[in-house]
Amino acid sequence: MTGGIHIEGLTKRYGEGDTAVDALKGVDMKVAPGEVVGLIGPSGSGKSTLLKCLGAVIEPTSGRMTLGDQVIYDNGWKIRDLRELRRDRIGFVFQAPYLIPFLDVTDNVALLPMLAGVPNAEARKRALDLLTALDVHHRAKAMPSQLSGGEQQRVAIARGLVNRPPVILADEPTAPLDSERALAVIRILNDMARQFETAIIVVTHDEKIIPTFKRIYHIRDGVTHEEAGDGRGFE
């Protein structure tokens, strides 16, 4: 598999000896460039642990991870600068928005590409284009404290997409949104995946969007199983 996300035999153990807990037990997973895949499972099944490993937030115990064309982990980290990886190669969309309180909406979204060296005008254009697509452009100059929960989430989604990273990890991105806006977010993710050859994993419990995925991974007790989805939202 060239590009995308490729996970082989990934494990994560917390603790030692009799008190050790195996959160991931040999996870295998593939997401092709240009593909959006759903990841579902009950609370405590290992979803968040898997995303944290993929996002280089925590270190796995063993296994192999490839993001894009780069092996980032093979029974140990294979890259030196994990902060640069998280900034430039991976887009994160969290259930809690975590917007910077002293920056307005546009600056919250434009900050990451500016830090990556994108000229200010281009970074702001990218930000406004995404804010428009997510129907929150009318709040471009508002401060985070002035936004509703749903508006904050849409701004956070724009921020996760603005750098056009090869990999996007989205954790419950549509939880606070109504059906129309939730499906709009999935359409935007799919459009971005196709346009920029982005590999996207969406962790969700949201029954509104589960039927949109063409492929779904179920995770339970740290083990993943793949199945075909309906894919209706991608037509």
Model-identified regions with their sequence ranges:
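ABC family nucleotide-binding domain
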Residues: 4-5, 10-219
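ABC-family P-loop ATPase nucleotide-binding domain
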Residues: 1-13, 225-235
